Amino acid sequence: MDQPGTYQSGMTQPSVSQPAMSPPGLSPHNMQQPGTSQPYMNQPSMNQPAMNEPGVTIPDSSQSDINQAGQSQPNMKQPWSSTNQPGIYKTDMSQLGMKQPSASQAGMSQAGMWQPGPPTSDMKTINPWQWDPEYSGREPSDTWQITQSNQGTGQSDTVQEDPSCAEQKQPDTWKQDPSFPGMKKTEPWQWESSPPSVRQIDAWKWDPDHPGSNQLNLWQPQLSDSSTRQFDLRQAGPIELGKKESDTWQLVPSQQGKTPSSSGQQDPSQQIVRHAVTWQTGPSPLAKTLSGPWHIGLNQSGMEQLNTCQTGFGQRYSMCQSSGSQSSMKEFHMLQSGSNQPDMNDVDVWQSGTSQPGMHQMDPWQWGHNYSGNTQSGQWTPGPNALVVGQFDSWQPVQPGMKYSESGPWSPRHLDMRQPSPSQLATRQFDKWQQNPSMPGVRQLYTWQPTSSFSDTRQLEKFHPCPINLNMEQFWEAVSRQPGTTQLGTNQLDTNQPDGTQSSQGGKTQSDKLEPSPRKPEMKGSQPDTSQSDSDHLDISQPGPSQLEPGESSMSDLNESQQRITQSPMGKKDSCSFFIRPAEPEDCPDILRLIKELASYEGMEEKVSLTERDLFRDGFGDNPLFYCLVAEAPSEQTESGVKTIGFAMYYFTYDPRIGKLLHLEDFYITEDYQGIGIGADMLKKLSQIAINTECCGMQFLVIIWNQDSVEYYTRLGALDLSCEEGWHLFRFNLDDLLELAEEE
């Protein structure tokens, strides 16, 4: 019992509920009187939808939530002396350790209590807000008081001093977490303190114990109390949902004995101190470029800077942490800017530091130098000066949470898009072929960034995700090479500078008889180079597991073939740089031209009835019937600056005895460009595609009188099934099919 004028701090009756003490007709759970203390009484629904007088709250006709001005009730939960926006502050009976700021009672404390009475000597108040100026100088060391004499309150922007307007709750406040009884969980925009023994996943903190809770749009710029994981920030007025505040958040002084939470709370007496950072930005929803600058404060010794940016209502927030090693953090959607953060499983991670081993990151930004050792999917790694990576249709940041596989060939592209091509060791970011699950092998549509040799070529290519790694979208970039040099780990293919020299190819001596076509004898009239081993031209290497994906290895092991500048004794082409890439729809006219050129050589040009429309429909739709590789070389005779000099058409078939096969239907290199290694590189790429798509072999047809090609492929190890197995190839033409279809 609390008598008027008497402050009793030790009278508790644990686990005793006295509903009879309430007047008739009033709910004992929503009643507060200056009479008998009722310990452990749960008084939820402290919802006050309108402005009330400083000491009285009468929210409805049932007279629940009545605040009677008077002496402090030690064991009764009092509602907030302020206007609470719609939302409910629910307190569960199972919440142990409730805080009571006016009386120290073992096992009982209430969070968010506003008590007019002074604290006693034996009380341990944690984060009570006292508004009575009479006791402005008596608060204990661990007590925050918003009074006129308070000098240590760390409040950003505006502190509301009026008791009638104090501690306004923002919309969508407290609600019960069903998976954690007794835990108070807030929706966004919550400003109350929390119980000491309750992990509060509120709007301004990320709790790693509850990774499924996506809290958003809040800052954590100050340090929490040891028992209350609470950020004592106040902001003038309610915050509009879904908008970022352009305010400067200041660090709130923290108390001794705090337990740093995983969301970035640290005691100032410890070695690592987190500082709030100014973030000024306008409204910027997720999936758009973040507007406004973000400024990291000065890095002091062992300091961690915490910027938790706001990204709008209903969207995930990002958090930026700088320096300091943090182990076993599993915070999603964090911007992490530090060195050595092992064991982190971060999604949508911004990283601006040195190597971070052991990180598995989806869709990250990295603007550091080199990230060797990282295993990162769909990661864009620009050079040292490239802060913003050119993304699909513009130069803008990658949106957090966006998967590159969602921006496939149907996404808008940016014409004439240039991609910086600095050397980046051990990053498989370029030259990776990627395949759509419905389009096995290497899809024809890619992004190709040329160098100066290809400055006037078509800039637009398209992407297709790899079926093994659907979240990856990579660039296939042509990079200039210096003579006699090699680039390791950058996987930048077959971009050759016409400097008249030949790069060092270990054991490779390109002759004029390297790329015979299955249908056309490229070396007719000359003897095959019998001194060349079978591996001189194919060189199919077994890549590692990460390179066996169709999106990667079909191009990743061709660095030694970057520069094919050879001397041809036949006098057709003394030297030439060439580039092999997947075909795109714009290549249909050139492909048809090469098909007719091959048919003309074989004496069957009149049999070609195919049109460009047929090629486009059958090879570049949703379910392509064939795939193509094209070879290009610089040319001054074309407006684009390059000329298509060869192609390979293939598709997939099935052998009921051994399984999936890659069938090479047509393979042709223009006569002027034969003998400089283009056909050999084309075969190598086709072989890698067959391996990556889990084919059991590659088969093709060679015209019977092309003895040079027969000998060439036999030397490489191909079996002549016409001789080995005695096969004859038959075909029914359309007329025959019509007759067969009509037969009964």
Curated annotation (Swiss-Prot):
Substrate binds at residues 601-602, 665, 699-701, 725. Residues 578-735 form the N-acetyltransferase domain. CDD domains: NAT_SF. PROSITE patterns: GNAT. The keyword Transferase applies. Residues 1-271, 399-425, 485-576 are annotated as: Disordered. The keyword Acyltransferase applies. GO terms for molecular function: acyltransferase activity, transferring groups other than amino-acyl groups. Its EC number is 2.3.1.-. Signal peptide: none annotated. Residues 510-523 have a biased composition (Basic and acidic residues). It comes from the Eukaryota. Residues 1-20, 29-50, 59-86, 142-158, 212-230, 248-259, 485-509, 553-569 have a biased composition (Polar residues). Residues 260-271 have a biased composition (Low complexity). It holds the Pfam family Acetyltransf_1. Belongs to the acetyltransferase family. This is Spermidine/spermine N(1)-acetyltransferase-like protein 1. The gene is Satl1.
